């Protein structure tokens, strides 16, 4: 979700996804990497989208679980499922089960942290040691991220497109 960019297309996206039997997820912009713009001007909380969708189509929370951080809702009038990921307004770190591995072999246990391990360096270990090392990295994931929506703070030195989400 981006303020002044796609906030007026939310209902169109919901309708299109419902008409084409797609599930969709709305995600708050994550302050990842240093950018030359004012993040606070772009920030749009998922509550904005939820309220807009609720007024137009009805919206109720449902028990629908995947392996990701999305919280799911169902529209009453369209009967489609919509996910919401809110790293800033409703931190989900306590249930995060994700790690990311880049194409050049760097393992990042958290999107909101610069901590990383070069897997290429540990591939020389036997499978048991490699497995132990990766398990240790996962076990020591940061407890939470420190994302903010101010214009001065950026948490990581890398951008989302280099890490994957």
Task: State where each predicted segment sits.
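Conserved C-terminal portion of the radical SAM core fold
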Residues: 1-36, 51-59, 102-104
């Amino acid at each position: 979700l981006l303020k002044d960019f796609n906030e007026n297309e939310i209902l169109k996206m919901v309708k299109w996804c419902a008409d084409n039997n797609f599930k969709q997820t709305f995600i708050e912009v994550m302050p990842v990497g240093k950018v030359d713009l004012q993040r606070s001007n772009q920030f749009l909380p998922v509550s904005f989208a939820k309220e807009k969708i609720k007024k137009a189509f009805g919206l109720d929370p449902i028990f629908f679980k995947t392996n990701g951080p999305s919280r799911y809702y169902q529209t009453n009038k369209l009967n489609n499922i919509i996910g919401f990921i809110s790293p800033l307004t409703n931190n989900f770190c306590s249930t995060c089960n994700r790690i990311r591995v880049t194409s050049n072999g760097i393992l990042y246990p958290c999107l909101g942290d610069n901590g990383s391990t070069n897997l290429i360096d540990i591939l020389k270990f036997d499978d048991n040691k490699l497995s132990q090392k990766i398990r240790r990295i996962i076990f020591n994931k940061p407890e939470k991220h420190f994302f903010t929506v101010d214009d001065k703070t950026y948490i990581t030195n890398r951008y989302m497109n280099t890490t994957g989400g």
